[in-house]
Amino acid sequence: MGKIQELIAGTTWELISFQSEDKNGEIIYPLGKDAKGFILFTLDNRISVHIMAADRNGNTGILFLTEAEKKMAELGYHAYSGPFVIDEEAKILETHVEVSLVSSYVGSKQARKVKTEGDMLYLSNVQHPERKLVWRRLKK
């Protein structure tokens, strides 16, 4: 088991920040600045991600970068789950999505660059590095 795998196995993390950057370099928050969420990593290498807008009204007034982000805003919620593998050398976590609120995610592989510092987990989308999520590990 690698270092990242050891750190996340059997843990739950709380969302601190979910942000993206538009084409003009402006920071946007696809589900609002106060989005809430959890990410769970099981001991048998499965992941479950749930993120929601605090107000869930779907009206953020932001022009989104992708159809998936538009769908998230409409619903005020994003969730997906499936088995994952970690490339410890490249520091990439890749999830094979089995279930998702966004139908285009089902059957896809979602790759995230991983960085850890203490009880903080930083994930960024490999294909869209402007999308960043910050998580804090929940205490046992």
Model-derived features with residue positions:
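Lipid interaction determinants
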Residues: 1-140
